[in-house]
């Protein structure tokens, strides 16, 4: 019986993986331009980190985490998101003792036991940034502007940036009371999860996707109407900075991110072309998270982008990305006598930084040339016994169909010039 991949996962194969690599390289480039340094955290952490950091009333903790007990009896969880691990790394490695703010970015797989569908998987990939150590509203605006800049460089269109403020520990009690007063008469109609969250965090009810809960919550109080003076001032400054940067936005008074650690600014980017899973990224400020995870009071802000969602949006908008590229050179041989010379040339090409390959199935010369075309080789170098005696090889431009005789001792330089000229054009 054939073993298949687990449900909710994907194999990223040649032809597709180049698109992923391109997006990741563009993300790394923009992160460097904005002053961020890369961080790589373990794909699994102690479960306690997510219980404390993500919030025990969230869907992630209650229903979606991959948690197991290891052979040492420790509870371990595959990371469902990377903000809490970044906080743990910030504290454990004493990054708070160095120059502030600390600006980090990451790229990697996350894991959630979710219902697989278009744009949603159990192993999915995120690109994200975190900034620790600054209360400045300009940082909130920067991460949003950076996200929109990145999408723009990929060519994505029809995007909407939704922003909101979800308050802070000073103004949250007022919001909590108003929400509880509003939802209390409807408590029996709420779903089981929302009823369990009612006392501890009624704000999470606004994020529920159940139709009945969404209908009941349609007229619920807005967080933005309960903001303290400090939060209101912070939000106004965020908006002014976005306007200064010419970043279009919509204030979405209903926006509540699905994680408990957010304070002040929350935002989400949506694409109109990808159906139900329209969100392609989001984030916000989390000024209390570092403290919750055992560190000193430290402000933070960040965002994460879903790589699969980005690819889906690009596809829906008909935006092409670099696909599979074959070797720049394929060595086709005629006769066993030329094999030693061909093998040596193959490795000289590779040492010169030219991607090259050859036949390993003892095909005929005609079959080798057909194979070179199928794998997308740019040039074929044909080495036959008669050419070798004359100290030459034949170089064929596979796209143009043109063929030239080239001295064997000059073929490396010839190909280098051809390939360089092609790349520049």
Curated annotation (Swiss-Prot):
Organism superkingdom: Bacteria
Protein name, as recorded: Histidine--tRNA ligase
Xref: InterPro entries: aa-tRNA-synth_II, aa-tRNA-synth_II/BPL/LPL, Anticodon-bd, Anticodon-bd_dom_sf, His-tRNA-ligase, HisRS-like_core, HisRS/HisZ, HisRS_anticodon
Record keywords, A-Z: Aminoacyl-tRNA synthetase, ATP-binding, Cytoplasm, Ligase, Nucleotide-binding, Protein biosynthesis
Record text on subunit structure and interactions: Homodimer.
GO cellular component: cytoplasm
Enzyme Commission number(s) from the entry: 6.1.1.21
Principal subcellular localisation of the protein: cytoplasm
Family: Belongs to the class-II aminoacyl-tRNA synthetase family.
Localization per record: Cytoplasm
A molecular-function term among this protein's GO annotations: transferase activity
Gene encoding the protein: hisS
Protein's GO biological process: histidyl-tRNA aminoacylation
The keyword Aminoacyl-tRNA synthetase is annotated on this UniProt entry: yes
PANTHER family: HISTIDINE--TRNA LIGASE, MITOCHONDRIAL-RELATED, HISTIDYL-TRNA SYNTHETASE
Catalysis performed (reactions): tRNA(His) + L-histidine + ATP = L-histidyl-tRNA(His) + AMP + diphosphate + H(+)
